[in-house]
Each structure stands twice: as C-alpha cells, then as structure tokens.
C-alpha cells in the first residue's frame, strides 16, 4: 500500500477498498503496512494519533465483522499519562523522551488485530528506530495474539523488531502458529528486508506474512516487497516494487512437518548460550 503522508481519511478509504478486493480474492487474514493511516506524520503528530476508542479503528472492526475476516496493521496511538500509570507501564514513561509533565500524553506505535469485529489483541512496538524514539514510547510486552474463532496464535512484529531475532524466537516459543510483520522499511534496505523476512521464517520454522509499505514520504521512499513465506522459508507470493494485493493459501500444518524434519527446537542447547545473550 502506498501510504499518503498525513492524509488519514484517504488512507483509511484506500485500505478498506484494498481489503475488500483481498476478501473477494479469498483472503481471510489481511495485513496493512506500519502506521498505514498517516505514515510517520511527525509534523502533525497529535492529529495523526488515535485515542482509543478510535473511529478509524472502529471502521476496521466493522469491516472485519462484515466480512468475517482478520485485519492487522499499526497506527499511532495517543495515551494520557494517567492511563500509562493505570495499566502499569511506568518504565515506558521513565524511558520516554517526551515531556515529563503529568498532563503530557504518550504515544505508541500500536499494532492491532481484529477478528470478525472483535479486537483479538494488540501489540506496542518494542523497538522504535532512531528518530522514532523522539516521539514514541516503547512497548514492554512480546506475546502472541490468540484468535478464538480461528483457534490459532499470531506472533506480531512491527518493522525494526524484525532485526531482533529474539522477538520472533520468543513468539515462536510461546506457541505462535504464524508470524506477521507490518513494516515501513525504506530504501536502500530492500536486500536486508528480503533476507531478514525469510531468515525469521527459516530459523523458527514458521510461516511469515511480511507487509511493507511502498511509495514516498517527505524524507525517504519505500520499496514494498511484501511477501508471504511458508515454514520452509519459501516465498509463496511477492508484491515486488508496486502497490498491489497478494493472496496465498498458507498451509499452517506445514510448520509441524518442517520441525519434525529438522528438529531445531529440540536440539537447542540453551544451557550454553541463554545467559550469554544478556551480555552487551
């Protein structure tokens, strides 16, 4: 999807239009790119942000209910400082580079997952990249999203999270059936994107839907290359460098076959390296 900079309503309409086309092609799970509604609209950040409950997210919930599907992506979330304390994430407040005023809002890159009209779960990006740290607080939880109707678990990553193998590994160890990454990887990092997306699938023996935006922003451009990858690491569908819809019927049971063939999880020797991973 080519995200129009700071143009929330137009992006929502485009996302719903493309999502409907995807459903008509047989899609049951739809993934939108990172901050699909506005892009990184720092110059109008407060306007770009969604305060829950959000009319924009309600539109997506209604779409998922009307079409009996799952829809995922991310938006900018605005949270009052009082709410931060209420939900028990003071560490985020302390680490934030935003104002420390008691009335100052906090912002997150919020990943959402609607299943047939219900918010199945959400995820706040845990690894903001460079400039993002000047605007976003860090999420403090990495857990799969459980879908009740589909009876499966989805591991959710947002963009820069993809560069940290620990994230996908933790999600896989927690029982994820599928990995989903929503991203805004810019040029000239297409080769990194291609390799990392496949690597997370191969090393965890898990299917991976990796959705990356395309188009231009004021300070960079994006290459797309959204992919659907199976548990063997084989790319089953690739959007290339254009705005389009890709659909593929993923066999989620393939994960179990691959793990029997190459028992990586059984053969791990965590006693040799688990503590070393904490060393800087």
Tell me what each language-model feature is.
Residues 49, 62, 81, 86-88, ...:
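Active-site catalytic loop in hydrolytic enzyme cores
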Residues 53-72, 163-245:
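CN hydrolase (nitrilase-like) catalytic-core segments centered on the catalytic cysteine
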Residues 144, 213-280:
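C-terminal beta-strand edge segments of enzyme domains
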Residues 6-8, 12, 16-116, 186-206:
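Cys-nucleophile CN-hydrolase/nitrilase-fold catalytic domain and related Cys-dependent amidase chemistry
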Residues 110, 122-124, 181, 238, ...:
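Residue-level detector of high-confidence beta-strand sites
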Residues 38, 45, 112, 123-129, ...:
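Short beta->alpha transition motifs characteristic of CBS
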Residues 1-5:
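Generic N-terminal amphipathic, Lys/Arg-enriched alpha-helix
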């Amino acid at each position: 999807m080519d995200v129009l900079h700071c143009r929330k309503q137009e992006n929502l309409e485009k996302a719903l239009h493309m999502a409907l086309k995807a459903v008509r092609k047989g899609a049951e799970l739809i993934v939108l790119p990172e901050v699909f509604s506005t892009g990184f609209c720092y110059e109008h950040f407060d306007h770009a942000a969604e305060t829950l409950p959000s009319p924009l997210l309600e539109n997506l919930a209604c779409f998922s209910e009307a079409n009996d599907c799952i829809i995922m992506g991310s938006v900018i979330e605005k949270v009052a400082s009082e709410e931060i304390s209420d939900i028990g994430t003071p560490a985020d407040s302390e680490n934030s580079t935003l104002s420390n005023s008691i009335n100052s809002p906090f912002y997150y890159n919020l990943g959402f997952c609607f299943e047939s009209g219900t918010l199945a779960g959400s995820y706040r990006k845990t690894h903001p990249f460079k400039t993002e740290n000047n605007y976003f607080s860090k999420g403090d939880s990495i857990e799969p999203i459980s879908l009740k109707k589909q009876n499966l678990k989805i591991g959710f990553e947002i963009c820069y999270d993809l560069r940290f193998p620990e994230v996908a590994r933790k999600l896989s160890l927690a029982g994820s059936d599928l990995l989903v990454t929503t991203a805004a990887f810019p040029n000239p990092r297409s080769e990194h994107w291609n390799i990392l997306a496949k690597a997370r699938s191969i090393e965890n023996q898990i299917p991976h839907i990796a959705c990356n935006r395309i188009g231009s922003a004021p300070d960079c451009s994006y290459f797309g290359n959204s992919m659907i990858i199976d548990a063997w690491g084989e790319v089953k569908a690739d959007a290339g460098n254009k705005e389009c819809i890709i659909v593929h019927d993923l066999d989620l049971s393939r994960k179990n076959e691959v793990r029997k063939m190459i028992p990586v999880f059984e053969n791990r020797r965590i006693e040799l390296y688990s503590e070393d991973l904490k060393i800087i």
